[in-house]
Regions:
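Membrane-proximal basic amphipathic "stem/tether" segments
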Residues: 1-52
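A short, aliphatic-rich alpha-helical micro-motif
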Residues: 52-53, 103, 125
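Class I SAM-dependent methyltransferase SAM/SAH-binding core
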Residues: 52-98
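Surface-exposed loop/turn positions
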Residues: 56, 105, 135-136
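A short acidic, Gly/Pro-enriched loop at the edge of an enzyme's catalytic core
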Residues: 94-109
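A short SAM/SAH-binding and catalytic strip from SAM-dependent methyltransferases
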Residues: 107-119
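Helix-to-beta-strand junctions that scaffold the AdoMet/dcAdoMet cofactor pocket
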Residues: 118-119, 132-134
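S-adenosyl-L-methionine-dependent methyltransferase catalytic module, highlighting the catalytic core
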Residues: 122-123, 127, 137-249
Length: 249
């Protein structure tokens, strides 16, 4: 894999202008009042980044079409060029478990509603840990099992994740897909996915491989050598989500 350099990235110069242009792109003329909507501006979430990672360069994994990251010092990455027909904000593209930057490159990593889509979170988080500086922070915003369409599914345990590392991937994915279809799609809890063929959901980033509450993710991160800085059951400006902030030790 060819390594990239942070110094080669074209960072945004003006964060407020970047934010305005993105809201304009997504909402059109409604921008003039949408700018101040709490669920769009996400002031509380932005403050957590300022409080826990107020300096240094960061990497956002799977940024999609919205971000809360400080654009003047964050590299926006994604695995996909577009999401549901909308162009990603990302300027660099790669798989979340294969990051083309050197060891200890970043002061923080931000991930919002990404890790639940990843089949092998242990491998992925270890890769994120590799590119984090010592004492670097990881910010995980994730869907809460009890407040999303995953509420009828069993939670993903650490042992489940260990099994995925060594088990037969094709068979395990088939079992997860069956659970997803039976407890989410067939119950009409995610109708925006109805047009996607079942087998496609495995490869296109649709399916939630993981179902968690904060305690599950805290255990996972501690098991991988992180210290927990902060966690919250319900994010004030994204109420379907919980937050865990951890530090590389």
């Amino acid at each position: 894999m060819e390594r990239k350099k942070i110094t080669d990235y074209n960072f945004e110069k003006y964060d407020s202008l970047f934010y305005f242009k993105n809201v304009l792109k997504n909402t059109g003329w409604k921008v003039f009042y949408k700018l101040f909507h709490r669920h769009i501006r996400r002031p509380w979430s932005r403050n957590q980044l300022r409080n826990f990672a107020n300096s240094g360069y960061g990497l956002e994994i799977g940024c999609g079409t919205w971000t809360i990251a400080p654009s003047q010092r964050t590299i926006f990455s994604d695995a996909y060029i577009s999401h549901a027909g909308n162009k990603s904000l990302a300027k660099v593209f790669f798989d979340a478990s294969e990051i083309p930057y050197d060891n200890e490159s970043f002061s923080f990593i931000l991930s919002e509603h990404v890790l639940e889509h990843i089949y092998n979170p242990i491998k992925t988080i270890n890769e994120w840990k590799r590119v984090l500086k010592n004492s670097g922070k990881i910010f995980l915003f994730l869907p809460h099992a009890e407040r999303t369409f995953d509420r009828n599914r069993n939670r993903t345990t650490f042992q489940d994740l260990k099994t995925r590392e060594h088990g037969v991937e094709k068979q395990i994915k088939k079992e997860i897909l069956k659970d997803w279809i039976n407890n989410v799609i067939s119950k009409g809890l995610a109708t925006h996915y109805n047009h996607i063929e079942a087998e496609e959901m495995i490869s296109d980033g649709t399916i939630h491989y993981n179902v968690w509450i904060p305690e599950d993710v805290i255990f996972l991160l501690r098991s991988l050598g992180f210290n927990i800085c902060y966690s919250l059951e319900k994010v004030p400006d994204r109420k379907d989500s919980f937050l865990v902030i951890a530090e590389k030790s």
